[in-house]
Design a protein with these regions (language model features):
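Positively charged interface segments
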Residues: 1, 16-19, 24, 148-159, ...
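Conserved AAA+/SF3 P-loop NTPase catalytic/coupling segment centered on the Walker-B
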Residues: 166-182
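Exposed alpha-helical structural elements
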Residues: 3, 7, 70-78, 182
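Intein modules and their embedded homing endonuclease domains
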Residues: 1-53
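Bulky hydrophobic/aromatic packing residues
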Residues: 29-31, 104, 169
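P-loop NTPase catalytic core of nucleic-acid-dependent motor ATPases
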Residues: 35-166
């Protein structure tokens, strides 16, 4: 008997599963002990038992949420120094990080964020903090990183590291002529 034929599979009841996701007004961040609903003006703590939707296990940050004074954050200090202690660059970087942590995107408003060295040359400089920033974001959202120097759109399985639960895709150190429009 072939159990996985359409004859047998059609007898199985289907289940409508609603995955939790961000909206235009809020972003969700999932920790081991609770979820956070982050809006422009507020952070609301939500117990998982009260949610009426599901979350990908791989999108849950593997640590408990503990409220701390964000002014003492090493990552915040790093962003400040990586921004050259310029208030404008610092605020821009905070906006970029916020945009990347917020998963609600539309086809008409979906941006590629490009982090580059202050001085662009044919030799990669490194040391400007791009990798640390991406790593930091990767600790908050499910991230897949692809080597931009060797990436080829025409290669079989070019996106094999991207899964249904991947939230962000980072091309690390892309070639000069990388086709962002593709």
């Amino acid at each position: 008997v072939q159990l996985f034929s359409s004859k047998y599979l059609s007898m199985i009841d289907t289940a409508d599963i609603r995955m939790d996701k961000d909206s235009s007004d809020f972003a969700m961040i999932y920790y081991s002990n609770l979820a956070l609903k982050v809006t422009k003006n507020n952070i609301e703590k939500i117990e998982y038992e009260t949610m009426d939707s599901f979350v990908w296990k791989s999108q849950v940050i593997n640590r408990d949420y503990v409220e701390v004074d964000h002014h003492q954050s090493q990552f915040r200090s790093f962003i400040w120094f990586a921004s050259g202690q310029s208030k404008d660059k610092y605020n821009t970087m905070k906006s970029v990080i916020g945009y990347l942590l917020h998963s609600h995107k539309t086809a008409s408003n979906n941006k590629a964020i490009i982090l580059n060295d202050e001085t662009i040359s044919d030799t990669p400089n490194g040391g400007s903090g791009k990798g640390i920033i991406i790593n930091g974001i990767g600790h908050m959202k499910k991230l897949s990183t692809i080597d931009g120097k060797t990436f080829d759109f025409n290669k079989s399985f070019a996106f094999q590291t991207v899964n249904t639960d991947t939230q962000l895709l980072a091309f690390d150190d892309v070639r000069k002529n990388f086709d962002f429009e593709r």
